[in-house]
């Protein structure tokens, strides 16, 4: 006859009870799983909605401003700038959703926002339009970037140099800036004003729901992720 010690019996009993409790804790029935998934989806939707509402509260727009009108004034149906405007874009995944972005090379908030967008450019197709908004330096730097053989590289140089102490960004030679580049920077600036833009940085994103969402420099990463439909939950 095989003898089993009392200690082994107690251990086996405890293990069986734990397994039974764990099994009961799992949502074994389909409707329970459905309810749990629905609650999670609702929580995600509420989080995104809260983030987007908070983003809107931070954006300053004119009373008669129209998001769709501004977006389509800068970016045509084929994704090409219109009205003589010109922009900087970065390579990324095909089929990315588009965002119009107006910046000034001498505006610290614009540079901060662009630094963040560099991390998202493979997911969102940012069309970045430099403006001559804050003065002659902005005009000449913007024109230099738009006239560069590689605009994205020139913009990267501006972001890097502007962030260095004692530097206001890339150097430029007024005598070498083409008339075409000058026309483009002023086309950007005048179009922004014509569509009732009031401050930089400023942008409009075409969301997955077909809505046009205005934005500016946001306080944290989560706001951008929610705004650009990049996450479902925090």
Protein language model features and the residues they cover:
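Short, exposed beta-strand "edge-strand" segments with a Pro/Gly-rich flavor and a Y/T-containing core
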Residues: 1-2, 23-25, 95, 144-148, ...
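Extracytoplasmic thiol/disulfide redox context detector
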Residues: 22-101, 105-137, 176-199, 220-234
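Intrinsically disordered, low-complexity segments enriched in small/polar residues
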Residues: 9-14, 19, 74-77, 82, ...
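Thiol/selenol-based redox catalytic cores and closely related redox-interacting motifs
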Residues: 134-223
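N-terminal export signals
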Residues: 1-3, 8-27
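Alpha-helix boundary/capping residues
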Residues: 16, 148-149, 162, 228-231
């Amino acid at each position: 006859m095989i003898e089993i010690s009392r200690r082994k019996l107690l251990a086996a009993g405890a293990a069986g009870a734990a397994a039974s409790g764990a099994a009961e804790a799992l949502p074994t029935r389909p409707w329970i799983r459905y309810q749990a998934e629905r609650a999670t989806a609702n929580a995600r939707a509420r989080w995104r909605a809260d983030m987007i509402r908070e983003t809107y509260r931070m954006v300053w727009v004119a009373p008669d401003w129209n998001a769709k009108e501004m977006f389509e004034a800068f970016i045509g149906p084929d994704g090409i700038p219109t009205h003589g405007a010109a922009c900087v874009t970065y390579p990324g995944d095909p089929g990315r959703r588009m965002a119009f972005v107006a910046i000034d090379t001498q505006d610290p908030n614009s540079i901060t926002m662009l630094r963040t967008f560099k991390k998202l450019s493979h997911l969102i197709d940012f069309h970045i339009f430099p403006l001559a908004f804050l003065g002659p330096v902005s005009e000449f730097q913007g024109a230099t970037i738009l006239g560069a053989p590689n605009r994205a590289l020139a913009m990267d140089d501006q972001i890097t140099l502007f962030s260095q102490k004692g530097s206001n960004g890339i150097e430029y030679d007024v005598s070498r800036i083409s008339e075409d580049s000058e026309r483009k920077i002023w086309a950007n600036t005048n179009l922004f004003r014509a569509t009732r833009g009031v401050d930089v940085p400023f942008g409009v994103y075409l969301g997955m729901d077909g809505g046009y969402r205005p934005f500016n420099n946001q306080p944290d990463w989560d706001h951008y992720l929610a705004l650009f439909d990049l996450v479902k939950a925090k």
